[in-house]
C-alpha cells in the first residue's frame, strides 16, 4: 500500500501491512507489525521491519505531514548532535503527496517510563520506587534543558530505558 493510504486508515488499521517506501538505497517495503501510538490521519508509530531489520517506524501523513516530518527530523538531529542518548535514525524520507517517515533502530526489551510508573503508582506517595522513576524522567529533562533543548509533547511514553540507559 502507499503511505498516503494511511491518511484514511483510522485508529485501528488492519495489521500487518506492507507500505512502499524508498530511501537512498532505493525502493523497499516496510512491514508494519504493530502500532504503539496513533493520531488518526496524521501519525502512526509502531514496530516494523525494513530491509530485514527491526525498526520503530514513525509514519506521518495528511496535510501537515511535511511540517511534522521536518520538526521530527530536526529534533532527532539536535538530540544526536548534543550527545543525548536517542535511538539511531536508520532511514527517513518525505514524498510530496504521500507523507514522511522516520525509521529508528528498535530498542528491543525497552520499557517506557510510563510502564515503569504504572508498576509503582499504587505505592504510598513518594515511595522510593516512585521517586526513582520521577528522578529518571526529571534527569532526562534536565539534560535536554542543559543543552538548550526541550520536547513539546513530553510524556513518560517518550522515555525508554534498557540496560541502564535512558533513551529520549
What kind of region is each of these model predictions?
Residues 98, 129, 161-162:
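Catalytic cores of nucleotide-enabled group-transfer and carboxylate-activating enzymes in metabolic
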Amino acid at each position: 500500500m502507499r503511505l498516503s493510504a494511511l491518511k484514511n486508515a483510522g485508529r485501528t488499521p488492519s495489521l500487518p501491512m506492507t507500505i512502499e517506501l524508498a530511501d537512498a538505497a532505493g525502493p523497499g517495503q516496510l512491514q508494519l507489525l504493530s502500532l504503539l501510538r496513533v493520531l488518526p490521519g496524521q501519525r502512526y508509530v509502531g514496530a516494523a521491519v525494513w530491509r530485514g531489520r527491526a525498526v520503530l517506524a514513525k509514519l506521518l501523513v495528511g496535510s501537515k505531514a511535511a511540517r511534522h516530518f521536518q520538526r521530527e527530523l530536526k529534533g532527532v538531529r539536535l538530540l544526536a548532535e548534543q550527545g543525548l542518548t536517542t535511538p539511531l535514525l536508520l532511514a527517513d524520507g518525505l514524498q510530496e503527496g504521500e507523507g514522511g517517515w522516520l525509521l529508528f533502530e528498535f530498542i528491543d526489551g525497552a520499557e517506557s517510563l510510563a510502564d515503569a510508573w504504572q508498576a509503582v503508582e499504587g505505592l504510598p506517595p513518594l515511595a522510593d520506587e516512585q521517586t526513582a522513576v520521577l528522578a529518571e524522567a526529571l534527569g532526562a529533562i534536565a539534560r535536554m534543558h542543559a543543552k538548550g533543548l526541550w520536547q513539546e509533547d513530553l510524556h513518560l511514553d517518550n522515555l525508554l530505558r534498557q540496560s541502564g540507559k535512558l533513551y529520549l
